[in-house]
Curated annotation (Swiss-Prot):
Recorded superkingdom: Eukaryota
Keyword field: Disulfide bond, Mitochondrion
Disulphide linkage map: C25-C57, C35-C46
CHCH domain residues: 22-65
Entry's Gene Ontology cellular component terms: mitochondrion; plastid; respiratory chain complex IV
Role description: This protein is one of the nuclear-coded polypeptide chains of cytochrome c oxidase, the terminal oxidase in mitochondrial electron transport. This protein may be one of the heme-binding subunits of the oxidase.
Keyword Mitochondrion: yes
Any Pfam family matching the protein: COX6B
Protein name stated in the entry: Cytochrome c oxidase subunit 6b-2
Residue ranges annotated as motif Cx10C motif: 46-57
Record's subcellular location: Mitochondrion
Keyword Zinc appears in the UniProt entry: no
Length: 78
């Protein structure tokens, strides 16, 4: 029997009560990178934040933010 793939998205977050998830996406992206800075790139503790932002954020945004982080122009508090 084949393994089933379970699809999940980020859980509801009281800080983001509306259907527009832009801030939720941005916050989860920042939380992930803060976590990896504090605990290291390979930390399993950070994986949940990665899952959340990957589920919420459009890929184009993530690509742009990654480029900005690499060039030192990312607008968020990392």
């Amino acid at each position: 029997m084949e393994d089933e793939i379970e699809l999940k998205t980020a859980p509801a977050d009281f800080r983001f009560p509306t259907t527009n998830q832009t801030r939720h996406c941005f916050t989860r992206y920042i939380e992930f990178h803060r976590c990896t800075t504090a605990k290291g790139e390979e930390s399993n503790d950070c994986e949940r934040f990665a899952k959340y932002y990957r589920a919420l954020c459009p890929g184009e945004w993530v690509d742009k933010w990654n480029e900005q982080r690499e060039s030192g122009t990312f607008p968020g508090p990392l």
